[in-house]
């Protein structure tokens, strides 16, 4: 597969065309950002780790009947993905109160929610990705009621699968954000990435009651280096994948 011209560059990834019109080339970057890009730093090896972690998670989800846009990992920081038309939407699932949910609703961080909360945020940097509801999305022609009738149950299935996956490696899935898109034939797919950049992950191995972050909150809150945490997530996921018969890159 030949990598052609750059189509897009975001905060954490670059997207390229390939010689197959239905396949794109993704390059993961070493940059980490917070606060709508106001805080930024490069971490050597982060792109490689996020590429590995996304590949592992998408492979584990596939074993559980959930398809993604992933075609194959093709290099340390690169992967091939199916071309999809993305919804300009961040889809957030919350299992435990944290982050924006706490500041918005005055809830103490760490409280277990009685049921998972599904939220939508419009992807718009100028407006700081505002929180929107179903009616907003339909009124603004971001998606249709029929789209939402597919997106919501798929998001909840992904949440259930990820809770189970992370529980197997002694990690609590606090919350996460995902994106979805449609292929040329209209199939709805999980797309973009699932990494410690896009999840809150708390270590459940004994830390004497103290929250041990294994995610980008280490960077957001100046709590420490993210690389050892990302390496730990990658290592545990790789062991789980091997135990399930998934081929893992060494």
From Swiss-Prot:
- Which one of the record's GO molecular function terms can you name? phosphoribosylaminoimidazolesuccinocarboxamide synthase activity
A Gene Ontology BP annotation from the UniProt entry: 'de novo' IMP biosynthetic process
Write down the Pfam families for this protein, in alphabetical order. Answer: SAICAR_synt (PF01259)
Keywords for the protein's UniProt record, in alphabetical order: ATP-binding, Ligase, Nucleotide-binding, Purine biosynthesis
Catalytic function, reaction form? 5-amino-1-(5-phospho-D-ribosyl)imidazole-4-carboxylate + L-aspartate + ATP = (2S)-2-[5-amino-1-(5-phospho-beta-D-ribosyl)imidazole-4-carboxamido]succinate + ADP + phosphate + 2 H(+)
- What is the enzyme's class at the highest EC level? ligase
Per its UniProt entry, which superkingdom is the organism in? Bacteria
Q: What is its EC number?
A: 6.3.2.6
The family this protein is said to belong to: Belongs to the SAICAR synthetase family.
PANTHER family per the record? MULTIFUNCTIONAL PROTEIN ADE2 (PTHR43599), SI:DKEY-6E2.2 (PTHR43599:SF3)
In terms of HAMAP family, this protein maps to:
SAICAR_synth
Record NCBIfam families? purC
| Name of the protein in its database record | Phosphoribosylaminoimidazole-succinocarboxamide synthase
Organism, per UniProt?
A: Bifidobacterium adolescentis (strain ATCC 15703 / DSM 20083 / NCTC 11814 / E194a)
Report which gene this protein is encoded by.
Answer: purC
């Amino acid at each position: 597969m030949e990598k052609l011209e750059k189509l897009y560059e975001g905060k954490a990834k670059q997207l390229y065309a390939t010689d197959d019109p239905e396949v794109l080339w993704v390059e993961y970057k070493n940059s980490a950002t917070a606060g709508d890009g106001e805080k930024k730093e490069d971490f050597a090896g982060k792109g490689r780790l996020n590429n590995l972690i996304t590949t592992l998670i998408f492979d584990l989800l596939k074993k559980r009947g959930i398809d993604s846009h992933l075609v194959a990992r093709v290099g340390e920081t690169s992967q091939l993905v199916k071309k999809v038309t993305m919804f300009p939407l961040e889809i957030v699932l919350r299992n435990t109160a944290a982050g924006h949910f706490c500041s918005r609703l005055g809830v103490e961080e760490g409280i277990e929610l009685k049921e998972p909360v599904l939220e939508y945020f419009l992807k718009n940097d100028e407006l700081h990705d505002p929180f929107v509801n179903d009616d907003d999305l339909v009124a603004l022609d971001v998606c249709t009621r029929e789209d939402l009738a597919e997106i919501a149950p798929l998001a909840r299935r992904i949440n259930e699968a990820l809770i189970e996956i992370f529980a197997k490696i002694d990690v609590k899935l606090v919350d996460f954000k995902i994106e979805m898109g449609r292929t040329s034939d209209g199939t709805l797919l999980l797309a973009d990435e699932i990494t410690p950049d896009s999840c809150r992950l708390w270590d459940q191995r004994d830390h004497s009651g103290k929250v041990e972050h294994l995610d980008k909150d280490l960077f957001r809150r100046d709590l420490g280096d993210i690389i050892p945490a990302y390496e730990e997530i990658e290592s545990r996921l790789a062991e789980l994948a091997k135990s399930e018969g998934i081929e893992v890159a060494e």
